[in-house]
Amino acid sequence: MKHIRTRFAPSPTGYLHIGGVRTALFSWLFARQNNGAFILRIEDTDVARSTQASVDAILEGLRWLQIDWNEGPYYQSQRMDRYREVIEQLVKSDDAYRCYCSKERLIELRNTQLKNKQKPRYDGFCRDKAPRQSNEPFVIRFRNPVEGAVVFDDLIRGTISIDNRELDDLIIARSDGGPTYNLTVVVDDWDMKITHVIRGDDHINNTPRQINILHALGAELPHYGHVPMILGPDGKRLSKRHGAVSVLQYRDEGYLPEALMNYLIRLGWAHGDQEIFSREEMVQLFDISAVSRSPAAFNPEKLLWLNQHYLKTVSPTIIAEAFATQLEKAGTDLRNGPSLEQVIALQAERTKTLKEMAQRSLYFYQEVRSYDEKAARKHLLATIVEPLQRVRERLASLPSWEKEAIHEVIVETAQLHQLKLGQLAQPIRVALTGDTVSPPIDATLYLIGRDSALKRLDHAIRFIHQGMG
């Protein structure tokens, strides 16, 4: 079997979006399961719109998702001489020609065709004319066949046939000599020996044109697979209005790469009823021919569910660094407080993203300076001062700071003062965290640590006394 070579070829004119990453994932999986090579190519010939920041974001996003590449990144902007060479080759073989049509003529042609309810297309005006010996500006057009059809077996959609009469002579070199997209893509796929082109179905109309250029060059055709687009929950094409669409935005919002990868592979592909896939299972089970031909609808709630699943199941050690980043963004000094792994293990069941986890864990690393007004009014009452003082004294005298011993102190104090456990636990929780929501109170006390816990209880008792005064 021929050595499989796939590629991902984004344009660095914006962020790396969800649709692009899913395409990259499918292409990467196909290469990996066939022991092939995955090539990264940056299509940066649009100099005006391409930015280094976009290139950096693409590379960073792929690395975050651990979509690694065997070759590249190759940059089209560094291959201009090669494109010009191929353009000259096509002109010499009479598979391309100079077109001197003015912009005005082409606009008039288009308007006439639209008026006559015809498909706008170039009419071949310069197709059989000899090159002019003048300095008039010209573009170079590919001489598309006028007979027969382009037929190819799409990996996802099956057999596709396009009549050559539906295709006009596309421009392959602009008036400044710069190559166009359809030319550069063909040359790159040819030179890089790409065997399988897996890309979005917005490129499907380009495929017959590119196949005809490859035929003219005498090149071997790759296999093509066109992945349907992703729709928003409202059924319209996924865009910024649907929320986060940049891959790095998901990272910054506290999603795990494992969750996003798992979610994307299920967008348009399924393996029975299985929802959770390890990276190894993705490589083993993914089948490009089983990808749905219909657009997939993006479901933010499903992604959140998956993210929480991975928060609960991935080792805290693996996500500690990302959690630290979220805490630091919230202005937290991590030198004081429990280990990140301990907090992750405690909070994973209660939060859906690392960002939410960080926001709900600030009190482990910061002193509580104020209380939620409603929580204080309900729980920090004069009647609770004596039980709080008792808890504070008992905690201070514990021989060792262990969860079981802490729990006993709270239970015994509640019984002594004829309180239900919640009637004592909630005031302690407000004292420790400033609010009424936290993990179990004994675990919260344990992680906050004895010294900090005692200070916070003292502060709450003073707060109540001030209110009484």
Curated annotation (Swiss-Prot):
| Keyword presence, Zinc | yes
List residues binding Zn(2+). Answer: C99, C101, C126, D128
One GO MF term attached to the UniProt entry: zinc ion binding
By sequence similarity, the record places it as follows: Belongs to the class-I aminoacyl-tRNA synthetase family. Glutamate--tRNA ligase type 1 subfamily.
**What protein am I looking at?**
Glutamate--tRNA ligase 1
Q: Do you know which InterPro entries this protein is assigned to?
A: aa-tRNA-synth_I_cd-bd, aa-tRNA-synth_I_codon-bd_sub2, aa-tRNA-synth_I_CS, aa_tRNA-synth_I_cd-bd_sf, Glu-tRNA-ligase_bac/mito, Glu/Gln-tRNA-synth, Glu/Gln-tRNA-synth_Ib_cat-dom, GluQ/Sye
Q: How is the cofactor bound?
A: Binds 1 zinc ion per subunit.
| Chief place of localization | cytoplasm
Q: Which PANTHER family match?
A: GLUTAMATE--TRNA LIGASE (PTHR43311), GLUTAMATE--TRNA LIGASE, MITOCHONDRIAL-RELATED (PTHR43311:SF2)
Q: Quickly give the catalysed reaction.
A: tRNA(Glu) + L-glutamate + ATP = L-glutamyl-tRNA(Glu) + AMP + diphosphate
Could you name the Gene Ontology cellular component terms for this entry? cytosol
Swiss-Prot/TrEMBL cofactor(s): Zn(2+)
